[in-house]
Amino acid sequence: MAVILRDINAGYNGRMQLCDVNLDIADRDFVGIVGPNGGGKTTLLRVFLGLLKPYSGTIEFQRDGHQVDSLSVGYLPQTRDIDTDFPMSVADVVASGMNSPRRLFGGYTKEQRERADQIMHTIGISDFARRPVKALSGGELQRVLFARALVSRPELLILDEPDNFVDDNFESFMYDTIRKVNKEAAIVMVSHDRQFVESYAKKIIEVNERIKILR
């Protein structure tokens, strides 16, 4: 797979946050994104995800050398972007990360539920699978969102500050999991943990309206 951004200009309400962005992401790449708050890091992720249409420029997705409309993507947003008042259980939130569609009637298939159960067990959240998300702590919610990002076995995993609110033990487990996923998928991660980014990212870019390739 590949993602190709060319001459991207993007922002909100006419205010530019990204200017002249050109970036290539290849299969099993690991791109670490750093930069100041408000510099456009999350805006760049939203362009990747198709959640924000750029003012100008193009974004192209490829699989096996051929252009496709989209890729299988797992996404972990910042918890502040999540409406925890929405009446869903932990299990439903995790299952919602499936890229394959739900059945028209009856919700998720048996196979989808089994996959959700498997990833919840792996991440260590099975004990509160039936709990409503509004009852979770910040650290618990971050684990749930991490599981949701992984459940579809994505080709591209996008993580926006995944280490927020998690304790040291889970952070170590999460980083180890990310390294394992990178053997099969490309990773794009925004993080303030420069040590991890510098140790494991194959590419490092700094975003502050424009992008600067650091490695």
Language-model-detected regions and their locations in the chain:
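The feature captures the beta-strand-to-loop junction immediately N-terminal to the Walker
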Residues: V34-P36
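Helix-to-loop junction immediately C-terminal to a conserved catalytic motif
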Residues: L49
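Conserved ABC transporter NBD signature motif
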Residues: P54-V73
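Conserved ABC ATPase "signature" region
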Residues: K110-F128
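Conserved ABC ATPase signature
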Residues: P132-L136, E140
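Hydrophobic anchor residue at the start of the ABC signature
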Residues: F146, M174
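Catalytic Walker B motif of ABC-type/P-loop ATPase nucleotide-binding domains
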Residues: L157-E161
